[in-house]
From Swiss-Prot:
GO terms for cellular component: extracellular region; host cell membrane; membrane. It comes from the Bacteria. The keyword Glycoprotein does not apply. Interacts with the chaperone ShcM. This is Effector protein hopM1. It is found in: Secreted; Host membrane. Keywords: Host membrane, Membrane, Secreted, Virulence.
Amino acid sequence: MIGTRVGGSGSTEIVQANQPQPSAAVAQAHPHAVSPSSNPPLTASQSAAQAPESSAAGAARLPVAPRHLPTLEKFRAEQPTVQGTSTPTISANAALLIGSLLQSEKLPFEVMAARLSPERYALQQFHGSDLQQMLGRFAEPGHLPGKAETEQLIKGFARSLADQLEHFQLMHDATAEAFGPGGLRDRNTLAVSQAALGEYAGRASKSIEAGLNHSLAVLDERIAALDSQLEGATEDSRPVLLMDRQALETARAMLSDLHVDFCKSPEAKRLSAVAAHTQMDALIDKLNVDRSSVGGWKGIGPIVAAAVPQFMVSMLHLGYIRTATSDAMKDAVPEKSADASMKRALAVGLTAGVAHEGVTNLLKPMVQAGFQKAGLNERLNMVPLKGIDTDSVIPDPFELKNDNGALVRKTPEEAAEDKAFVASERAVLNQKKVQVSSTHPLGEMIPYGAFGGGQAVRQMLNDFNLLNGQTLSARAVTSGIAGAISATTQTIAQLNSTYVDPRGRKIPVFTPDRANADLGKDLAKGLDLREPAVRTAFYSKAVSGVQSAALNGALPSVAVQPQGASGTLSAGNIMRNMALAATGSVSYLSTLYANQSVTAEAKALKEAGMGGATPMVARTETALSNIRHPDRASLPHTFQPDTLGGVPRAVENAYHMARGALQLPTQVVVDTVRVVEDGVASGVSSLRDAHKPAETSSPTADDAAAVELTAMEEGRRR
């Protein structure tokens, strides 16, 4: 329910497309039909109340609250269309009256709307519609409708339904805008109507897809039934059954294509967006309630849920595995060897990079599943946080608008302006979602500060002889603590992150993720090497690990006390050692984080129409774009171009260019490996096909049926 519902002035008329309800019953009613029949059975009095009745006759018996009788009189005096035209008017009274009716009697929204004015507010219903009847014909051999005709009817029904939903939402908006400073009781009444409209819109927006799914299920049942009949069919009945089965298979293929096409269509997207507008109040209330469940001291749960697994993975892959490998290579490769640096970088980088990806994707899902298994997610709120769905909070703008009480379609200029506004608001929200992550310039400072600061403190304590900070465990535990601090800081920032929509409503950007963990699926997401995306992630982390190790190895060694000397280092050497320890940690992480964000940046670049022309080198293309076009909108930005004369944005752009420079060497190698991998896989497949022996197996049942059907048809033609 953002401000983009209503644009400027326009003159295009909207003609309501209420389909007449056919009297013929449909053989199989859809189980999720958008109609009163999908609700609990109506009582006798309720059923009688649904009989067609004129507005004038029914208005006298409307059970509205006494305080709403003057509003009812105003509604009766309204004109349904703009004088002298067929353009519908938007009533500022109807929504309140529907809410009043719903407070007196619990009925579906569409029933109450029609009761208020059957001439004006007879809402679209899938059940009993021409569309449902046409879909029913797919299960009748010999009565298959045309694909183009069906597609046109589906999209026409969807457009008409979306127009009606927009009309009703604009009606509710008009009522809300008419309220004065008071009117709390009426606002509650309007909220009842708004909630009921959202519930109806949720059913209605899904009715077409559900109807298509239902028809596909019916076809599957019919085909299965024919298969059973064919098993015991006689020679006389078999040809007819085969023809019926072939007809149903053809119908199913066509219906499946229609289903896929509709789900991807602008009409389906518009229906989802309109439904999101009608459900916005309920969604925001739910998001705030969910956010309150981890508010205050309860926020310790999400903090622990983030800090504990991060402590474990950082201690293991950055601490023990990377440090142990580095120490082992120092002993194995002589310092004076000409290629010592390269050998160490390869060994340490490959090991640490693969460990970083593998350990993270192994331990984090296991720890979260463990929290759920122990019930800590319910008792102590130990749940992760997830970003809210941007499109649900900021849906696409309406195509219709309220033009001084008239329902008209926006002009192309108004529609383009509203879409641009929505895009800008989504960009703001998306920035907030990534602002504290390691893929954002500011977000990266959190782990840099935690890990760099942790290693600096460890080095300082070692140089002051307060502990032996050079042991494997000391360095590993420091990495673990730094990881926990980083995760804690990020979670606290997420718990306090809010987005203010154009209507001034505060919406939490992150919400608790209380979904039941599926450990098998969660592990497969990051560890199933059969998936190309998983392999690419490992390639990227391994190669970037080598690059990180090479950069880290180029740093000078820390100063140490001469052999046999006592006391501590000078203050200057201690400060130098602390700086080197911090720099070493940051130099190692910077390449990992830069390359970690390539996948998301490549996707955003493609969606913006600036990349993806050559899929095999998409990652290299992304790195180059970060160097050449750091100011593009698809990259995360904290500052606007005009903030403080553009200086902060220029610094941010330089940062993106540096990230691109770190990404480029790694991603060139990754893309090369992917090309080689695809070439090898293609070659092996071709070789296997070339040496595959000719098959002489008997035809399958489907093949036999097709042969018999063809022979039968040829016999008829003779």
